[in-house]
Regions:
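Preference for long, amphipathic alpha-helical scaffolds in soluble/luminal domains
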Residues: 1-328
Length: 328
């Protein structure tokens, strides 16, 4: 599968001429999805397709006036506010992918700290208690006070990805304090009521949903409706920061996942709990498909062991907790 992906990469470093995974429900050709898949296969910054993609992603970290917006090119034309918004958005998407690929230097560290400061600043702002306003029967609109320098830094999956793959943040007390503050807000009723849409962005060309909020549902919802694949992807990020055992709701989910381990030490979650054709399931899957029960079991066991390993190692640093909060 990795070699097939490599062959489909375009000369501009993208797949399909797109950067961002717009549809969260299915795996479409784009730079973001392709890189995440390659990372799963063990490809890193030393490989040719990752290098080509990184070259494109680095352009979003600059202040170039003639920046190429790819799939957003038409959207930003003659719309200054939308251009500022997508400059920030693509910068955030790009930084997360570059860090995940192993591109870490002083410049990227400063960019991570800046985004953490801006996100924590939003959470500290009184507007965070009511970041949207009703404008009729449609989605609520993000309030002007929630914006800063052309972007609403409401925590979302892309900001969380940046923090999750920056474990060096756990070496600083100020950074840890800000991370806890951000995730306390994510787990709050105010945020959860807004997620995953997070409100409307209004510009000269109309409005669009910001999206990408982290929605954590009750365990009964996943058991009844499925979508456990989405929860596992979110847990993959949260475990990188060792924050799962800070929240009773997340720990109840985590303990239930642990209870699904078979007597032989493996996991094979029921297919009905996973959205078989979803983007999230595709990103969880390392094998080419799950037609074989053995392939699915191997993938799920690997994912679960990784969750437990990351959570245990990182919680010691994040929460200064030496005791194991759950049995392994």
């Amino acid at each position: 599968p990795a070699l097939q992906l490599q062959r489909k990469q375009r000369k501009d470093g993208t797949w399909g001429g797109k950067v961002h995974a717009a549809d969260q429900r299915k795996l479409e050709p784009c730079l973001e999805n392709a890189l995440l898949a390659l990372f799963n296969y063990g490809w890193n910054r030393e490989t040719k397709p990752v290098k080509a993609a990184a070259k494109t992603l680095r352009t979003f970290l600059t202040q170039k006036k003639d920046l190429k917006f790819f799939e957003f090119q038409k959207a930003v034309k003659a719309d200054e506010r939308r251009e500022r918004y997508y400059r920030w958005f693509l910068r955030i998407v790009a930084l997360g992918l570059l860090i995940r690929a192993g591109y870490l230097d002083d410049r990227s560290r400063m960019a991570v700290l800046e985004l953490l400061d801006r996100t924590a600043g939003f959470v500290d702002n009184p507007v965070a208690r009511s970041p949207v306003e009703e404008i009729g029967a449609s989605h609520p609109l993000i309030r002007p006070a929630a914006w800063r320098d052309g972007y609403p830094f409401i925590p979302d999956v892309y900001l969380v990805r940046i923090f999750a793959y920056s474990p060096w943040l756990l070496d600083g007390e100020l950074a840890k304090m800000r991370l806890k503050k951000v995730f306390d807000y994510i787990m709050s009723p105010t945020y959860q009521e807004l997620a995953p849409d997070l409100g409307l962005v209004r510009t000269a060309k109309g409005s669009f949903v910001k999206g990408h909020g982290l929605r954590i549902r009750p365990l009964e919802y996943y058991q009844k409706h499925g979508h456990l694949d989405e929860l596992l992807v979110l847990f993959g990020l949260l475990s990188q920061l060792g924050l799962i055992n800070r929240y009773p709701l997340l720990m109840s989910h985590f303990e239930w996942l642990h209870s699904q381990q078979n007597r032989d030490g493996r996991w094979n979650l029921p297919t009905k709990l996973l959205s078989e054709g979803s983007r999230w399931t595709s990103l969880l899957r390392i094998e080419k498909d799950w037609r074989s029960p053995a392939r699915k079991e191997a993938d799920m066991t690997f994912r679960m062991l990784l969750l437990f390993k990351n959570q245990w190692e990182r919680q010691v640093r994040m929460l200064d907790r030496r005791d194991d909060g759950y049995p392994i």
